[in-house]
Amino acid sequence: MKKLKRIAVCTVIILICFLLETTIFQYLALASVIPNLLIVVTSSFGFMRGRKEGLFIGFFCGLLKDILGGDLIGFYALVYMVIGYCNGFFSRVFYDEDIKLPLALISASELVYSLIVYIFLFMLKSDFNFWYYFNHIIMPELVYTILITLGLYQVILHMNRRLEEEEKRSASKFV
């Protein structure tokens, strides 16, 4: 029952972030870029819950992006899966009181995501203007994502703490 509740909460978080990214933040674009909320969700669950959950959350975030806005089905799912899985390696050194590690990991994830998108969606189409892409898309999106992360991460952290407390309470009833 608790696992089902965690799945439902994660699904709601993913859907809300996707809807915010594709609706409201389209109107709040700065320098024609929007924050990547799904990277924040994928990275956060990766380093909070581990590699396996980071992989699954990343897959569903990427698949949602593929189905509702991508050119290639599976491209974003693969990219987000790898990012979630790699963030899961840091679950052992994650302390929820310290925000420096989450900000660094989310920033690195956003940078890796943007570089992969550039390489596979632009450079392979003979668009070699990397510095223009870096200065006008990657860096503004990175800064905007970091600013939004300061608030969104706290919400995700609070939800994760509540779910973990409920899981611990229900586990202690059976012992």
Model-found features: residue ranges?
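Terminal, non-globular segments
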Residues: 1-175
